[in-house]
Amino acid sequence: MYLEHFGLREFPFSITPDTEFFFSTGVSQEALNTLLIAARTGEGFIKITGEVGTGKSMLCRKLMASLSSDFKVAYIPNPYLDPDSLFMELAAELEIEFDADTIAKHQALRAIKERLLMLHNSGKRIVVCLDEAQAMPIETLEALRLLSNLETEKRKLLQVIIFGQPELEDKLNHPSIRQLKQRIAFEYCLAPMGRDEIDYYIQHRLSVAGHQGTRMFTRPALWLLKLRTHCVPRLVNIVAHKALLSSYGRGRKNVTFWDVNAAVNDTASLRDFGTKFRLAFLLVMLLGSVLLLLIDKGYFR
């Protein structure tokens, strides 16, 4: 591939969340600070929402890496769980051993509470992180509320952080789980990066991957990258990776406007926007030509 060609140790624009590549934008740092403060308070639910590709999974991984050894984190990435399966997953994360085929739900819940009390007495705080929560069944979200009832006289035994797309809000408005929504103490909505942050984001990821040379992406390339990806981190990564492949295929050491354009045209989710952009550009050019012709003919004298 292009690693040796560009002097890189690893791929700089992988879409797999890797906290070594975490880039602190104004939005992501504020969200991380909110999560860290909320986790230390130990009260209620925490909700993080954002459109596809805005960095929810990366933020979740960064949070888990940032929590001190006082915390025990249970990470549940699979949202398609019924309540019983949720309890089994949580038990596995908490290192509780029992026969999942024979134990009843109330017994599993009791075993979880006993384990939580033991961890609490040893000075541990428990944080449960659930990804893609918008896909969770209503009854599983209600089971989460039941878990949040586990507490001592002074504090909750576990903190629940749910990450999801904006549709999660619609699900939380369901009448049967209105009590869960009332328990959300902190929430934050992730937005795409700012246009002025993309240049630094690209350079940051290249540097982490081992690049030590001069600017690799030309200014026209960055301009088109911002325009076509709307500064959504996942789309930026996908297009930047393909643009590097294009540059490598042409035997160059930098990424040009045309490399980004080729990358965009190779990305299905951006093709429709590209077609609309070209049609709009042609329409503007046509209207401009007609206007100049009318001026030349003296229609505006």
Language-model-derived ranges and their functions:
Residues 1-42, 289-301:
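A short, basic N-terminal segment
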Residues 11, 70, 84-100:
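Conserved NTP-binding/hydrolysis module of P-loop NTPases
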Residues 42-62, 79:
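Walker A/P-loop nucleotide-binding motif
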Residues 47-53, 104-107, 134-143, 148-176:
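Sensor-1/coupling segment of RecA-like P-loop NTPase cores
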Residues 47-49, 130, 226:
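Residues at the beta-strand->loop junction immediately N-terminal to the Walker
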Residues 82, 98-143, 152-156, 194-198, ...:
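Mid-core helix/loop region of P-loop NTP-binding domains shared across ATPases and GTPases
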Residues 93, 117-121, 127, 150-153, ...:
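Helix-loop-helix "sensor" segment of P-loop NTPases
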Residues 212-213, 218-301:
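C-terminal alpha-helical "lid" subdomain
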